[in-house]
Amino acid sequence: MAAEGGRCQKSYFDVLGICCPSEVPLVEKLLQPLEGVQKVTVIVPSRTVIVVHDVDAISQSQIVKALNQARLEASVRAYGNGSEKITNKWPSPYVLLCGLLLVVSLFEHFWHPLKWFALVAAAAGLPPIVLRSIAAIRRLTLDVNILMLIAVAGAIALKDYSEAGFIVFLFTTAEWLETRASHKATAGMSALMSMAPQKAILAETGEVVAARDVKVNTVIAVKAGEVIPIDGVVVDGRSEVDESTLTGESFPVSKQPDSQVWAGTLNIDGYIAVRTTAMADNSAVAKMARLVEEAQNSRSSTQRLIDTCAKYYTPAVVVMAGSVAAIPAIAKAHNLKHWFQLALVLLVSACPCALVLSTPIATFCALLRAARTGLLIKGGDVLESLASIKVAAFDKTGTITRGEFSVEEFQPVGERVSLQQLLYWVSSVESRSSHPMASVLVDYAQSKSVEPKSENVSEFQIYPGEGIYGEIDGAGIYIGNKRILSRASCETVPDMKDMKGVTIGYVACNNELIGVFTLSDACRTGSAEAIKELRSLGIKSVMLTGDSSAAATYAQNQLGNILAEVHAELLPEDKVRIVGELKEKDGPTLMVGDGMNDAPALAKADVGVSMGVSGSAVAMETSHVALMSNDIRRIPKAVRLARRTHRTIIVNIIFSVITKLAIVGLAFAGHPLIWAAVLADVGTCLLVIMYSMLLLREKDSRKAKKCAASHHGSPKKCCSSSHHGSHAKKNHGVSHHCSDGPCKSMVSCKESSVAKNACHDHHHEHNHHEEPAHKHSSNQHGCHDHSHGHSNCKEPSNQLITNKHACHDGHNHCADTSNLHDTKKHDCHGHEHSTCKEELNALPPTNDHACHGHEHSHCEEPVALHSTGEHACHEHEHEHIHCDEPIGSHCADKHACHDHEQVHEHHCCDEQQTPHTADLHPCHDHDHDNLEVEEVKDCHAEPPHHHNHCCHEPHDQVKNDTHPVQEHSISIEESSDHHEHHHNEEHKAEDCGHHPKPKDCAPPPTDCISRNCCSNTSKGKDICSSLHRDHHTSQASRCCRSYVKCSRPSRSCCSHSIVKLPEIVVE
């Protein structure tokens, strides 16, 4: 990638021969003397050399040639063409030959002359080391190549040829491994730099041109599946754009005319025409690439300390090694070979590659990881400061709040100016401003048929922390907060303190207040969550805003009063003063802002965070961290990343030092192993690189995989910690709830013989739950499949063993604290945005209370029943119910089957049943289109305004001598055509209610055919026979089961749509 500025060009080179910072001086001394080279930057972690040069004086190929003369394996990096590929996939021929010969030399015990192959192996791998050493010596620099060359020469002098061969092989192999290990980081940087394509298509002619040649205000065409090459505004078309590469947002963003689009983002579907607003080199992605590039050269205090130590460490160890070899020789000590070997071990250990790499490689990986998630951290020093933050100060407008204002009130003061004239003046002056309030006022004026004319405004001026000024039609207009009135010399200011939660603006002209307006703003989604996360990290959060105290207090209340301090009505200098006080009182301070007013405070803070793309250019340039999106939840993620990076650097430093000390200690203890010293040196470098690259991995994905895997083997836990899960409590062995969060596991809920089992599946998939059969006459089994459900169920702990209590809550909190008798059952099915209240204190001991709250419903239903067993399956979707249903009947068992799908009507009917009735009321067919109610002739006639779906049989028919204990078996089947829902009909079925307005009762659809068959009676057998005749032959064997056959592909269960209903067979 090349950035041109006049006759200069910035070129990028991959230099694989750079293995540690000790070779940086060599590269600089090779290139800086060349004519036309203006600046040389070496980035060791990514093995990149950036050269600013005159293209007429020296070309890229000449620079590559100069680097390769020192065997640095340089090549030109080409961004944007997608051709970046893995280089050095295999070791060089020198390394392969060296290794092969070294293996042959290992068989010298079988044939002694084979030992010479080790010497040949050393000679075969030396050429790259020798050439680099010569280049370093010519420029009077001491690097690792010279140290390794001396170590090889010393081993050969001691006639330890195998040692010499191992030194060369280990060093060259480790260099290749380091290159391969760091390729991922280099590839990540290449992808970041080449996000924007190098070509663009002109919308008018269809001509393909270079992106860098496209001028501002040129309309370019972007088709579906293409990457937007230049920043701009959509002028035609609509589409969804994936901005994850730039902002880290995972969801596509809808774009329509007047929407801003950014270079490097992907147009998913649809054609759009974009008018460019910047040159390719000044696009957001280009700025991001430059910031990351500059950040790599910004050293932290830890890195500067290590570099300083390394500067003196290498010469000191070289002198020590020379002394260890020279002094015994001069003193004519015995066993000189041992002292020479010890000197060589010290010499190899003189290169602090791993120690010097410990900080920059970790910093590089952290900066790249942050950039991938929409965080631009400008250097290792910022990352280090971010890890020690104790206080976070937030601006309000556009940071904590959305910055998307709405005009609540706009009115003139007095009779001097009309509303239309006032709107014209305000909108015209505000059209010159970039403040978030400005566009809202302009839009409001246009909605009142007032067109602003910014060209008529002169002498426009911004007063930070106060407002703006402009002259139009000979009148000087001041617009801003209360302070602007002092500047406008207004004598009277109205008292507006009683207006809570709004931002108050004033309009003044000629020393007189002529207008007042109020704007409201809401907190961003995730603001409270971000502040809570910071608090969990031990970071105090405060608000600094120039807005009114009322607006600041309102925002604090919206956040749940989680801010430690709130400072309102501040000027920019006040924010700077408070940030300084926070630094002195609490420690390192972080400041988050998005506007020009925040720039001084951002610069004053230890770490300033701007809102990036949406923020002002001044704030982005002044800040130390830029958010490429408006999600401030990335701030605690940045703090976590910084702290994790700090820990990684500490581990790298400790490991680097310990390995050096261990090798030297081993040598002084009488075991001077040169090959071990080489392995410790280059091997430690490799391990430091690999450990640092763990920062590139995403921790959340590993946790999610771990959670998903654990739930396959542990059905009882069921993702209790997930955001979409539910909380359930076990009540004395009576009720066990299994709540499955967003895991794709199939969970079975088990219970004791006297317990009730409720299995709730809350997920974002179409999952099905299979549950084993449970045998007991008093058991109740309910299986509810909820999609996108959030549940919080609280159940009483003082239930008896036959109590049945289920709390099913979708997007709701349903609580029951009543004391239940052992024959009571309480079902609370709370659905989306519903409130369910139960009052059971007035009920007799045998009462059964059922409350089904649906979407936007408030339901209170006292129910009195004599029942010992009950099966309830309720399917409600998009219901709006407000009903009170007193029901009284004497039943031994009860079965109610309600199938309501997409019916926005009321089905509340009332029927008073006499005790021990033997009448049969089968379920009726429901149809959206044909609003008819079909009744079987065996059922009693009901009034026209009642819709009853009841199936009753005498009490003595329930008991069966051959089946004293009921067996409940539940199976789940899925069909592309239909879903069948079966229930046991050996119980009485009843749905009796009353609705005050019969006209609101609408029959359900006909395509869902529902039958309740009770074949234990003669009437039930007649119904079975009728099923044979009514094209339901396949279901004749299931006559005594209640089933639903629906032709629709999607069903509902408990007001949750698009949930595939299981087939439930109760036998």
Swiss-Prot record:
Q: Its GO biological process terms? A: transmembrane transport
Basic residues bias locations: 724-735
What CDD domains does UniProt report for this protein, alphabetically? HMA (cd00371), P-type_ATPase_HM (cd02079)
Q: Where are the transmembrane segments?
A: 94-114, 117-137, 140-160, 162-182, 313-333, 342-362, 649-669, 673-693
Q: Name one GO molecular function term.
A: ATP binding
Briefly explain the null phenotype.
Reduced plant height and biomass. Reduced grain yield. Decreased levels of zinc an cadmium in grain, rachis, husk and nodes.
Ranges for domain HMA come to 9-75
Stored Pfam families: E1-E2_ATPase, Hydrolase
Ordered alphabetically, the record's keywords are:
ATP-binding, Cadmium, Cell membrane, Ion transport, Membrane, Metal-binding, Nucleotide-binding, Translocase, Transmembrane, Transmembrane helix, Transport, Zinc
Could you say which enzyme class this protein belongs to? translocase
Renumbered residue ranges of the record's region Disordered: 711-739, 760-790, 960-996
State the protein's name.
Answer: Cadmium/zinc-transporting ATPase HMA2
The primary gene name is HMA2
